[in-house]
Structure formats: structure tokens, C-alpha cells
């Protein structure tokens, strides 16, 4: 079955220096096979990969958590440059299921 990724909230506003948490829920367990991406950017900039490993050059202000079906992306000490659309993606999915992206 296809994996559906649902992100909440759809939008969030916090002051500079604050903290934001974005949630991502999978329609079935994906263990910890999740990545987070940031747009703008073509292709989208990878932030965190499986096991919550930070991509090269990404600030440690970004952190990930969760497993199974429920995941979070937390951005602390917010900066103006963090204003963007963030996407979760199920990775490492078996060949008989399509990978799912959150809605951003």
C-alpha cells in the first residue's frame, strides 16, 4: 500500500529566537526511515536523513525525532532565513509501496 505522509501544522509563525516543531505522521510504520527537506531551493535542500543525521552544512539548530509513524522536526533559535516550506519524506520504502511526501 502507498504510504501517505501528513504534516501539521500547515503553517506556523514564531518570533526570531523562538522554537518551532513540525509534525509528520505516516499512514503505516516506516521505522526511522524519514528525511526532512527545506524549500526554497531546486532541488529542495536536504536537512535530516535516516537516524536524524544532519546533512552536511546544516545547522545543529535543526533536529529530528520520532519513529514508526510519528515524527518531528524542531528548529530552535529561529532566524529569518528559516522562513521556508519544509517537507518530510518516507525513505527506504520497499519496492511494492510508493514513497510518500508530506504536504509541506
Curated annotation (Swiss-Prot):
Region: Complementarity-determining-2, residue numbers: 50-56
Recorded superkingdom: Eukaryota
Region of interest (Framework-2), residue spans: 36-49
InterPro entries: Ig-like_dom (IPR007110), Ig-like_dom_sf (IPR036179), Ig-like_fold (IPR013783), Ig_sub (IPR003599), Ig_V-set (IPR013106), IgV_Light_Chain (IPR050150)
Stretches for region Framework-3: 57-88
GO biological process: adaptive immune response
Coiled coil spans: none
Pfam families attached to this UniProt entry: V-set (PF07686)
Region of interest: Complementarity-determining-1: 25-35
PROSITE patterns, alphabetized: IG_LIKE (PS50835)
CC annotations in GO: immunoglobulin complex
Residue ranges of the region described as Framework-4: 101-104
Family annotation (SUPFAM superfamilies): Immunoglobulin (SSF48726)
Keywords: Adaptive immunity, Immunity, Immunoglobulin
Annotated segments matching region Complementarity-determining-3: 89-100
Keyword Cell membrane: no
Region (Framework-1): 1-24
Note in the entry: Residues 24, 53 and 56 were not positively identified. This chain was obtained from antibody to p-azobenzoate and was isolated from the serum of a single rabbit.
Protein name according to UniProt: Ig kappa chain V region XP-1
Source species of the chain: Oryctolagus cuniculus (Rabbit)
Amino acid at each position: 500500500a502507498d504510504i501517505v505522509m501528513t504534516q501539521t501544522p500547515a503553517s506556523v509563525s514564531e518570533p526570531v529566537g523562538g522554537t518551532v516543531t513540525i509534525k509528520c505522521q505516516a499512514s503505516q510504520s516506516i521505522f526511522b526511515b524519514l528525511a526532512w527537506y527545506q524549500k526554497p531551493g531546486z532541488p529542495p535542500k536536504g536537512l535530516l536523513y535516516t537516524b536524524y543525521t544532519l546533512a552536511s552544512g546544516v545547522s545543529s539548530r535543526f533536529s529530528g525525532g520520532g519513529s514508526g509513524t510519528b515524527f518531528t522536526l524542531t528548529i530552535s533559535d529561529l532566524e529569518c532565513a528559516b522562513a521556508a516550506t519544509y517537507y518530510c519524506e518516507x525513505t527506504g520504502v520497499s519496492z511494492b509501496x510508493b514513497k510518500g511526501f508530506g504536504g509541506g
